[in-house]
Amino acid sequence: MQTLFKEVTPKRYANGNEMKENSSNVLDQYFTRPSVALKCFQKACEVIKKYENLDDFIFLEPSAGDGVFYDLFPKNRRIGIDIEPKRDGFIQCDFLNYKLPTHQKVICLGNPPFGHRGVMALEFINHARNCDFVCFILPMFFESQGKGSIKYRVKGLNLLYSERLEKNAFIDFKNKEVDVHCVFQIWSKKYQNKKSEFSWYKNRHKEPFGEYIKVFTVSLAKNRECGKEWIFNQKASFYLSSTFYKSIQIVESFEEVKYKSGIAVVFTSANKALNTKLKKLFKEIDWTKYASLATNSCYHLGKSHIFQALYDHLDILKDN
């Protein structure tokens, strides 16, 4: 179950700034559709069994709600926890105060409360960090690769797997479908994903891929004005809109950037063949696979997404 409620303790962003209360998150509830829960459970089993024998684990659902995940677990190896249990068999407890088993291997799987900008979900993950695997439905903030991403505050766990959930993955208390953009992620205490990911958080004080390009945020949107040097005084090699729906266009001037906000890309190499290859690469990349998906179904593109795309295609650039 997903429960969003008023938080008493002040929460903070990755940069340390205190969060403001979001009144829309007070006493709101929705539940994971059974078919979606089944897909998440099956994916968790598929990924984990590559590393361990599933028979060695007990399964734990925190914030169990109506037990949509709990009912999928082996009957003799399952624990359900909820602060307000809706059925018999669950342990009545705030998961953040629950003492996790230390003598058994544990897979923690479920849909924790998100809280404002995912901070409560972060607390659930960090409390579960002594579990062998943590498999949670999470807000899209956990997909972000920006330097302030909340996922860089996960302690003692490694991200093994992440996928975006399908549309209408939830139902409300009236059994009506609810479409909230979320991801399903699998974290491990012991194992790491062999596919490396570019971390802008670790490179935030550097100029990533400076041998190829420099990237600037440019905007004339109200209260977001920035990068005016590359709007009025200098011309970038090309521009991209930072907000788009189905596809994105590479344009030659800021005037063509949609919504007055975008990214200016400036070549740093004098190698014309390399620059041509770079521009072609930017046109061919499926940016929906890199950009962040917002609740209104639009995509937001930032520096971190561009750096990840370059990181994934370095072999093409180096073969020059």
In which residue ranges do the predicted regions lie?
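Class I S-adenosyl-L-methionine-dependent methyltransferase catalytic core
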Residues: 1-320
